[in-house]
């Protein structure tokens, strides 16, 4: 499975959340509402989630292994940095 498109849908400079993105896989499956967060060790992605009645956040969709998570995160952050650089 490959990342075939990354669309930056919203960019913000407020708080730790920097952008919301949609990622398409193999030109046939899309995951919306992936967040780019600025953490203590740099940018990372947070998968779409919902709040349970108990107040916990549970991922709606997420990679099941580290290799896939790394691939998605790399593609998303590279696209975000390219968009930010182009806007400066």
UniProtKB/Swiss-Prot annotation:
Alphabetically ordered keywords of this record: Cell cycle, Cell division, Septation
InterPro entries listed in its UniProt record: SpoVG (IPR007170), SpoVG_sf (IPR036751)
GO BP annotation list: division septum assembly; sporulation resulting in formation of a cellular spore
Iron-sulfur listed as a keyword: no
Stored Pfam families: SpoVG
Family matches, as SUPFAM superfamilies: SpoVG-like
Keyword Chaperone assigned: no
Family: Belongs to the SpoVG family.
Chain's role: Could be involved in septation.
This protein's name: Putative septation protein SpoVG
Species for this entry: Caldicellulosiruptor saccharolyticus (strain ATCC 43494 / DSM 8903 / Tp8T 6331)
């Amino acid at each position: 499975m490959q990342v075939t498109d990354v669309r930056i849908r919203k960019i913000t400079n407020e708080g730790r959340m920097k952008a919301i993105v949609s990622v398409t896989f193999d030109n046939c499956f899309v995951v919306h509402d992936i967040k780019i967060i600025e953490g203590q060790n740099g940018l990372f992605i947070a998968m779409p989630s919902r709040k349970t009645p108990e107040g916990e956040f549970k991922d709606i969709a997420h990679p099941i292994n580290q290799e896939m998570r790394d691939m998605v995160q790399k593609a998303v952050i590279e696209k975000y940095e390219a968009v930010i650089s182009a806007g400066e």
